[in-house]
């Protein structure tokens, strides 16, 4: 059995860290892991349980019922009253299953603090293919054909921006990711970085290769401490596995990455 605790900011605010600590201390019958936000913040804390290949999702798991919840899992009382009352409702499951996720495909699925989980989900394959098989110009053309555009009001074409950066004069070029969100209640960037930081790193490296940059910077809000912690860990893991730094994947392309935390706002 594997127990996975949803530990995005929303889950932690609802008590997920206490749930993880309880299972870490009292549970010996299951493997324990974490994941990010799957997008149903209103149902946190969320606990996924995988048993014999079947995944069950339990919602609003309060810290006050942890002893009973843990005992029911240990005894595999999946059809019992307690577990059935906490299981994800069909209408919520339908809400998820109708979605086609691209940038969010791994969020709430993999462990955001594990590069092994990301690689197992197909991570860094696109980067390796780009570095092995494509020129920077071919990458930009592929982005042009895809129709990828900025998510701001202007919908600015990504290929145009990358192409302009590549053709601009200067030996030293930088790729900057703006993960600062000033709109009240907005946390799209936070959700991605907290739940799938290696996805951001891989995308930035492909962009850096396309424009000829040897350094990438992520500007993150100081109010996103968990995002900063997980991205810092992901950068270190990518460096250790050879996906960041000198001669990435033996391609001759080199790029380093760093985080710049914002000064905070009021």
Regions found by a protein language model. Give the residues of each.
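Feature of Fe-S/electron-transfer and energy-metabolism proteins
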Residues: 1-266
